[in-house]
From Swiss-Prot:
GO BP annotation list: CDP-diacylglycerol biosynthetic process; phosphatidylinositol metabolic process; phosphatidylserine metabolic process
Organism annotation: Saccharomyces cerevisiae (strain ATCC 204508 / S288c)
Keyword annotations: Cytoplasmic vesicle, Endoplasmic reticulum, Lipid biosynthesis, Lipid metabolism, Magnesium, Membrane, Nucleotidyltransferase, Phospholipid biosynthesis, Phospholipid metabolism, Transferase, Transmembrane, Transmembrane helix
Gene encoding the protein: CDS1
Statement: the UniProt record of this protein carries the keyword Protease: no
Its job: Supplies CDP-diacylglycerol, which may play an important role as both a precursor to phosphoinositide biosynthesis in the plasma membrane and as a negative effector of phosphatidylinositol 4-kinase activity, thereby exerting an effect on cell proliferation via a lipid-dependent signal transduction cascade.
Protein name, as recorded: Phosphatidate cytidylyltransferase
Membrane spanning residue stretches: 71-91, 154-174, 188-208, 214-234, 255-275, 330-350
Length: 457
């Protein structure tokens, strides 16, 4: 039986199965190699082309970003030299653009198409708020002109009440515009609008006050934020290892602290450059002032050198018991500290807002940079702090001719103004500034004026 050839197929079948399995495995491996080779040959050229295109795109974006950076810097300094009025116009333009971008990011445009009053109400509340906040600060520069026209004088004198009435009209308009099915969106939009008004328009108003207090208090905070942003990036890419905050993964602790050092150094340098110019340090009394105007004033004491006594330990080691320095340098270091440790959180807040609504930039108004908001997100919080710091530690609250005139025109009637002028003339006559002959002539004029006012009343 064992010699029968028909009894051997069992062993032969096993060998056949093994050989077929090996051949199949080899064929599959070879096929996979060929497919992988074909795939790599077909993908490689595309990858190279896409890499080249990416590099070209980055170069182009860098070029555009650089060009527009110089355009913005040049425009900023031209505006600065043009005068305080143009700086205020720049701030107003930035706050309006920022408001528009923030509202656009946080609003559902598809639903707004069915609610046209939503956009109208947003803009109405914006200009009402600007009129309320900035109107009072700017009216004083045109007080004498407004007084000549009864309507304008009424608007200036009753500014707060008029603003309240305007806001009340907006409130009524909002309630009348409510529609079923859109209530959640409409109330949400109203809340967002008020939040943006608070974070943008109110803080921009404080920056405008910085301009009126002296361009130094506008220029230095802006410069410190820019320097901090630059060195946070440079220190971050050079030394950065520790992530600073979850919402901005690229921000590092090393960049944050390194920028603090360089911003403090920059504050000393910028103060040294800016403080000698009275055009920058003097409060403005005439909005027609520009760089070529001879703007002079009695300098705030912080811009004047003062003697500071050093602790005895310094005298023992270096034989120096006092130093003479302008106090503004110490204040500049305080501003630099805020610009480094707190102002960046304005940018982090903006980053969180963009992530919430899944957008890369707030807009495309500045090629290569994004929107206006992307560039000024830290400036608002810095500017508001600078104003509060100035009012708390720097301002002397001096009484100027403009403030006295504003008080007189807003609170006295015509008869009281005539009486005030009469008293002032008598005072100047007693001091010998007005001669007796001129005093008699002026007295006659005022007596006639008083009689005419009495008859008219």
């Amino acid at each position: 039986m064992s010699d029968n050839p028909e009894m051997k197929p069992h062993g032969t079948s096993k060998e056949i199965v093994e050989s077929v399995t090996d051949a199949t495995s080899k064929a599959i491996d070879k096929l996979q190699e060929e497919l992988h080779k074909d795939a790599s040959e077909s993908v490689t050229p595309v990858t190279k082309e896409s890499t080249a295109a990416t590099k070209e795109s980055r170069k182009y974006n860098f070029f555009i970003r650089t060009v527009w950076t110089f355009v913005m810097i040049s425009g900023f300094f031209i505006t600065l030299a043009s005068g305080h009025a143009w700086c205020i116009v720049l701030i107003l333009g930035c706050q309006i653009a920022t408001f528009k971008e923030c509202i656009a990011v946080t609003s559902a445009s598809g639903r707004e198409k069915n609610l046209p009053l939503t956009k109208t109400l947003n803009w109405y509340l914006l200009f009402t708020t600007i009129y309320y906040l900035d109107g009072k600060s700017l009216f004083k520069f045109f007080q004498a002109t407004f007084y000549e026209y009864p309507v304008l004088n009424f608007i200036v004198t009753n500014h707060k009440f008029i603003c309240y009435c305007l806001y009340l009209m907006g409130f009524v308009l909002f309630v009348c515009s409510l529609r079923k099915g859109f209530l959640k969106f409409q109330f949400g939009s109203l809340c967002v609008t008020h939040m943006v008004l608070l974070l943008v328009v109110f803080q921009a108003h404080l920056i405008i006050k910085n301009v009126l207090n002296g361009l130094f208090w506008f220029l230095l905070p802006c410069g410190l934020v820019i320097v901090n942003d630059i060195f946070a990036y440079l220190c971050g890419i050079t030394f950065g290892k520790t992530k600073l905050i979850e919402i901005s993964p690229k921000k590092t602790l090393e960049g944050f602290l390194g920028a603090w050092f360089f911003t403090a150094l920059a504050s000393i340098i910028l103060t040294r450059i800016l403080s000698p110019y009275t055009y920058l340090t003097c409060p403005v009394e005439d909005l027609h002032t520009n760089f070529f105007s001879n703007l002079t004033c009695e300098l705030n004491p912080v811009f004047l050198p003062q003697v500071y006594r050093l602790p005895p330990i310094f005298f023992d080691k270096v034989q120096i018991n006092s130093i003479t320095v302008k106090p503004i340098y110490f204040h500049a270091l305080n501003l630099a500290t805020f610009a480094s440790l707190f102002a960046p959180f304005g940018g982090f807040f903006a980053s969180g807002l963009k992530r919430t609504f899944k957008v890369k930039d707030f807009g495309h108004s500045i090629p290569g940079h994004g929107g206006i908001t992307d560039r000024v997100d830290c400036q608002f919080i810095m500017g508001s702090f600078a104003n509060l710091y100035y009012e708390t530690f720097i301002s002397e609250h001096r009484i100027t001719v403009d403030t006295v005139l504003s008080t007189i025109l807003m609170n006295l009637n015509d008869k009281q103004i005539i009486e005030l002028i009469d008293i002032l003339i008598r005072f100047l006559s007693k001091k010998g500034i007005i001669s007796a002959k001129n005093f008699e002539k002026l007295a006659d004029i005022f007596n006639v004026t008083k009689k005419s006012l009495t008859n008219h009343s």
